Amino acid sequence: MIEDNKENKDHAPERGRTAIIFSLKNEVGGLVKALKLFQEKHVNLVHIESRKSKRRNSEFEIFVDCDSNREQLNEIFQLLKSHVSIVSMNPTEHFNVQEDGDMENIPWYPKKISDLDKCANRVLMYGSDLDADHPGFKDNVYRKRRKYFADLAMNYKHGDPIPEIEFTEEEIKTWGTVYRELNKLYPTHACREYLKNLPLLTKYCGYREDNIPQLEDVSRFLKERTGFTIRPVAGYLSPRDFLAGLAFRVFHCTQYVRHSSDPLYTPEPDTCHELLGHVPLLAEPSFAQFSQEIGLASLGASDEAVQKLATCYFFTVEFGLCKQEGQLRVYGAGLLSSISELKHSLSGSAKVKPFDPKVTCKQECLITTFQEVYFVSESFEEAKEKMREFAKTIKRPFGVKYNPYTQSVQILKDTKSIASVVNELRHELDIVSDALSKMGKQLEV
């Protein structure tokens, strides 16, 4: 069982839970050395987990959930910076104790949409903290600008309007280069759903070569189309936190623009990737449903199950292919926002396999190079059905159902909760039956 360390609580009123995430090279003894620093400063570690870095294939990211006071944390933060390559520190309520006996080891997950405030700021990098190989690492003006965007995202709360950004000429020029080059490829590479929705975004959200759309405008557009909304985020989230947002039809979206020195490359998701890669398909009902179901399957799932779901998400929503009119077309956002890999994926030289979650979840995700294999689905509906079957294999002592009226998840774990859902379905079937009856009378059937 995971629980807060309550010892000496009266003598340390400023103690609290904080998440620290840092990167380690894949070498013997690295983790032991880092954890020894926590021991020396008497920092209690409540939870530890590791995952392969999304930025460097040779490194691992370590997440630790700490219970300590601010002075101890500041000391450990400074010590870690001299031993590891990336350090991020944020308040956390990521894990907690569940009261039901069969739920006590279930990781914390948001129950209502406002709970995303508790995990949306758990970014792996913050503001001006860039890797040494980042194109903007030596550009102090760019780093300052990145911190500005990060602060906006970190201060955002559910229900707030997304702040309007006055983009610089340099940022608009960078966006324009990406927009112009990608639009040359979309007619022959993008799926029909993407091509249908892109003109709507031009009309209603200001998608143009000389204009970067505002996230608030995009969020309102998506809300009317599929119920999805946009939430600004400062950078990478953990797979668990990102997928949790999808369960509530919330897409965490960056606002910063990639560095102008190399407009056709970015080592991380930026607003070009989000707006040109993801948004057009989030405006498609079937795709939106597919994305939400992956998110719902992740709630309360084990770390292993979440990683499998995240990998399936990566090879579908980010790098997925589909068949249309007998030809391969792209629907993955990572491809639709990358000129070189978009060309490669349909070049004939790329390796392609049918999408099968049981196989796909074992494939390695590559960040800095082209994928070794791409997975193709016959349709979004087929991909959705396969993911539904795969989700049934995830061991979880309850089911979940999203309630769009309260923007919360219903926990289905007893006959009472199941009966409530059955009553809702019965009412909806009555509506359908009544409509069919009226249609029959009109047709004199």
UniProtKB/Swiss-Prot annotation:
Class in the EC hierarchy, top level: oxidoreductase
EC numbers for this chain: 1.14.16.4
UniProt-listed Pfam families: ACT (PF01842), Biopterin_H (PF00351)
A GO term, aspect molecular function: iron ion binding
GO annotation, biological process: aromatic amino acid metabolic process; platelet degranulation; regulation of hemostasis; serotonin biosynthetic process
Gene3D superfamilies (alphabetical): Aromatic amino acid hydroxylase (1.10.800.10)
Protein residues bound to Fe cation: H273, H278, E318
GO CC terms in record: neuron projection
Function description: Oxidizes L-tryptophan to 5-hydroxy-l-tryptophan in the rate-determining step of serotonin biosynthesis.
Subunit and interaction comment: Homotetramer.
UniProt record similarity statement: Belongs to the biopterin-dependent aromatic amino acid hydroxylase family.
Protein name per the record: Tryptophan 5-hydroxylase 1
Organism, as annotated: Gallus gallus (Chicken)
